[in-house]
Amino acid sequence: MPQARGEGATPPTSLPNPSLKGVPLPDNPNNLEPLTREWLAAIGEDPDREGLQRTPQRVAKAWAYMTEGYGQTLAQVVGEGVFAAEGSEMVIVKDIEFYSMCEHHMLPFYGRAHVAYIPGTRILGLSKFARIVDLYSRRLQVQERITTQVADAVEELLAPKGVAVLMEGIHLCMAMRGVQKQNSSTTTSAMRGLFRSDPRTRAEFMSAVQGTLRGR
């Protein structure tokens, strides 16, 4: 597999400027503090008791981090990490950990993402794949959408011959409430270009990641 060159290098001037946009965060994330106090009172807690006095501040800080993807763009997280291709073989980045918040119950889901592409004229610094996954995971999300957004981003950046994204997640909204199935996991995929049209290419990718899938 070809390796991306050092990320400090200057990318070719002909590369497009990525245009996927983020959503600005509120001017004052601390607005979450009074809302958290109200929420604590609504569930029957005393927000002024010793163990909860600083909880609104902690919650506001935690949610600012867990949703920082809203305030970022694809161009910002990739920076100068796109380079001219030096090969055309499949590149696979496996076992990218992700953490996100379910938009339906605002409970966490987490797991691993595997991203592959077949270069055209451009390649991407390997660490940027993790940054792209974080960009879309750190929002209120569903796993299906993250999978599609990561594939869309790689396509926009590189115009490759093919892109594959496979994500496997454990959803606490399913494990700790509702049906309460702690051993269940969800797998989603997005296949583009050669990964969709050529069964051999798709099989090569699936074979490479098979051993990392949960329960395999």
Swiss-Prot record:
Region annotated Disordered, chain positions:
1-33
Q: What is catalyzed by this enzyme? A: GTP + H2O = 7,8-dihydroneopterin 3'-triphosphate + formate + H(+)
Q: Does the keyword Hydrolase apply?
A: yes
Which EC numbers does the record give?
3.5.4.16
Instruction: Quote the cellular component terms of the Gene Ontology held in the record.
Output: cytoplasm
Compositionally skewed regions (Low complexity) per UniProt:
24-33
Positions bound to Zn(2+): C102, H105, C173
Task: Report whether Phosphoprotein shows up as a keyword of the record.
Answer: no
At the top of the EC hierarchy, this enzyme's class is hydrolase
Which pathway does this chain act in?
Cofactor biosynthesis; 7,8-dihydroneopterin triphosphate biosynthesis; 7,8-dihydroneopterin triphosphate from GTP: step 1/1
One of the GO BP terms on file? tetrahydrobiopterin biosynthetic process
Q: Which GO terms describe its molecular function?
A: GTP binding; GTP cyclohydrolase I activity; zinc ion binding
SUPFAM superfamilies per record: Tetrahydrobiopterin biosynthesis enzymes-like
Keywords on this record? GTP-binding, Hydrolase, Metal-binding, Nucleotide-binding, One-carbon metabolism, Zinc
List the InterPro entries hit by this protein, alphabetically. Answer: GTP-CH-I_C/QueF, GTP-CH-I_N, GTP_CycHdrlase_I, GTP_CycHdrlase_I_CS, GTP_CycHdrlase_I_dom
Record NCBIfam families:
folE (TIGR00063), PRK09347.1-2 (NF006825), PRK09347.1-3 (NF006826)
Q: What quaternary arrangement does the UniProt entry report?
A: Toroid-shaped homodecamer, composed of two pentamers of five dimers.
* Family, as annotated: Belongs to the GTP cyclohydrolase I family.
Instruction: Please report the name of this protein according to its UniProt entry.
Output: GTP cyclohydrolase 1
